[in-house]
Amino acid sequence: MGFLEEEGRWNLSFSGAGYLGAHHVGATECLRQRAPRLLQGARRIYGSSSGALNAVSIVCGKSVDFCCSHLLGMVGQLERLSLSILHPAYAPIEHVKQQLQDALPPDAHVLASQRLGISLTRWPDGRNFLVTDFATCDELIQALVCTLYFPFYCGLIPPEFRGERYIDGALSNNLPFADCPSTITVSPFHGTVDICPQSTSPNLHELNVFNFSFQISTENFFLGLICLIPPSLEVVADNCRQGYLDALRFLERRGLTKEPVLWTLVSKEPPAPADGNWDAGCDQRWKGGLSLNWKVPHVQVKDVPNFEQLSPELEAALKKACTRDPSRWARFWHSGPGQVLTYLLLPCTLPFEYIYFRSRRLVVWLPDVPADLWWMQGLLRNMALEVFSRTKAQLLGPISPPATRVLETSPLQPQIAPHREELGPTHQA
């Protein structure tokens, strides 16, 4: 199997996905159940944005129940806010940072060093950095906070890491080492990634940006909206199930599973191989020495009547994470009349909520105020110096000689020779 034959010769790379990071959770659970060697023997696991969260959960050995409960728990909190991401209580960076401080083990930086790679984008020049060494657990958490920080969506002041400001790593390198043949890439968007949904539309147009290639389609457009504004818990849970199916298709196409599971899900018999081997009919197209069986079908979540038979652990974790408060009060506020009453009371409740949550965020920000103000002062000073230097260069630049006016003459008229002054000695009569 090429580079998969020797342990430690392949990498895993997870793209930025926002709330669609649930796709990474499902794909990881499929690899853990059906091909654990791909996770255990990986040389390094890269990630940008929410993909870095999935990568650190793999390195630290977190269970699928842990990942689903934390990710879908955040979606549930957002679902309860009347204005969704516009509500003043919405603070994704603070929430994730607190969850990481509570959940990561004290030696997480030791486990992550030299095995985890986090993509960061330096502000303001946009240069990409891959961080692979972490001195403390707090430094690891700060690197994760930086790669999750999407400008304006998460705030106005970028977080600091090792004396410099960084933002979302997906804005400069969304899929680290995607061009390397020995890297297994994972993404929830339709495209040419190893583990990704297969588009049902015949659109062949692709967009390559930020070291990432994806198809230009309506499916990807709506997936991009779900990344930032998840509509419901069920939609995110289905995306997690789709990640499991996409990873299973990846394994079956490369002959890394014992039996063709996807054929049974679509109620079809697998094509009978000519020589009696499951690897027959493979297309010998290489990416690091892997043969691909393109006859493996693409299965969507709606095609699976009972997902629990496919992965009981993942389905149990998703059902547990999607469970809402069963009380009558909670059910009333989720009903139609409750939603109408919520919006009718917004003019009365929103000002108090705004003052409360903004004041609380200000208290949390107080320890970082001196450093942030100093950074903003330096940023404004550099911008002013840049504007001054450009203005000075334009006003006091070298004076160019006046342009020579060329007179075009008709071919029927004699050309007027330019006047030249003779500097030689004068002739006497």
Swiss-Prot record:
Let me know which tissues express this protein, per UniProt.
Expressed in brain and pituitary gland.
State the name under which the record lists this protein: Patatin-like phospholipase domain-containing protein 5
Q: Which Enzyme Commission number(s) are on file for it?
A: 3.1.1.3
Which parts of the sequence form the motif DGA/G? 168-170
UniProt catalytic activity? a triacylglycerol + H2O = a diacylglycerol + a fatty acid + H(+)
Q: Which residues form the active site?
A: 49, 168
Q: Which InterPro entries match?
A: Acyl_Trfase/lysoPLipase, PLPL, PNPLA_dom
Q: What does this protein do?
A: Has abundant triacylglycerol lipase activity.
* GO function terms (MF aspect): triacylglycerol lipase activity
Please tell me which stretches of this chain the record labels as motif GXSXG. 47-51
Motif (GXGXXG) positions are 16-21
User: What keyword terms does UniProt attach to this protein?
Assistant: Hydrolase, Lipid degradation, Lipid metabolism
Q: What are the record's GO terms for cellular component? A: cytoplasm; cytosol; lipid droplet; membrane
Q: Which residues cross the membrane?
A: none
